[in-house]
Amino acid sequence: MSDAMRAETVMIEGHQGDQIEAYAARPIADTPVGGVVVIHHMPGYDQATKEMVRRFAANGYAAVCPNLYWRDAPGASPDDAAAVVRAGGGVPQDRLLGDLAGAAAYLRSQPNSNGKAGIIGHCSGGRQAFLAACLLDFDAAVDCYGAFVAAPPPPGLPIAMEPLLPLADGLSCPLLGLFGADDKNPPPSETEILDAELTRLGKTFEFHTYEGAGHAFFAVDRPSYRPEAAVDGWRRIFDWYGRYLAK
């Protein structure tokens, strides 16, 4: 498989028809491909997230990351935009879902799309990936250490959010969860609650918890990076999408 790709900043249609910035990459190939919506983490629409978009394209998927902070701070640095959004209480849920639905529609509208779209997120993006998989139309989802899915957030968190466990019955696609045994948000006790609920509901899912890994073990530019967990996690991600996004 060739890793030739096209990567660029584009404008896509988001919530209520708004035009928002996004970063897209796709393999240069004639064969139909699946798509992946990449949700950036709370620190914002940054270079690490764009590198992830390109990684999917290099492995045969079209991918797009919508800038969820575009309306709040267009043109600002990721850190500044994230600070503005946190100060405002976070991205409203309806707007978030509208932008993610727009990103999926963008992928499915591409000439080489096979009609399938997955979603992935890390940290806050992992939580949002689970939310989107419960309320929107996706073919596969990956939650990388998304917190406050099965438990409420601690008091004083600047962004308002509620547990998502009551939405689990609506999970519309297979879910892969990748977690660290040493993580505090979410701790293993929280992922065990979610595991039990998805099992009770008969959902298709797989969870993997890595010993010796905490939060953000995929982040190569942080002290939290754990190479063995990250390498195995990427292998599982591509296996998962190969199973559910390829035709």
Tell me what each language-model feature is.
Residues 1-247:
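N-terminal cap/leader regions of alpha/beta-hydrolase-fold enzymes
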